[in-house]
């Protein structure tokens, strides 16, 4: 999530400008992402790589999808 990225960035004392330079994602895109949570998949991937969070990003996309609505209901 955007909040998680912001927290990691701040914990590592990385400014939004520095993250932009590290990731190749524009400062405006990073600022917008941290404010609204909206970002392209490509930019999110670049940010994840720059912050060494690629494994977390991969985990999002490798989760097993639900087979039916009952699985969703059972999980809640």
State the predicted function of each range.
Residues 36-49:
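Short, basic-rich loop-to-helix N-cap that marks the start of a DNA-contacting helix
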Residues 5, 16, 27, 41-44:
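Helix-turn-helix DNA-binding elements, focusing on the entry/boundary residues of the two helices
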């Amino acid at each position: 999530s955007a909040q998680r990225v912001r927290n990691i960035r701040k914990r590592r004392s990385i400014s939004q400008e520095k993250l932009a330079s590290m990731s190749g994602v524009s400062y405006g895109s990073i600022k917008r992402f941290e404010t609204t949570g909206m970002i392209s998949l490509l930019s999110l991937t670049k940010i994840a790589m720059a912050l060494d969070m690629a494994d977390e990003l991969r985990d999002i996309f490798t989760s097993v999808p639900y087979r039916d609505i009952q699985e969703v209901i059972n999980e809640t």
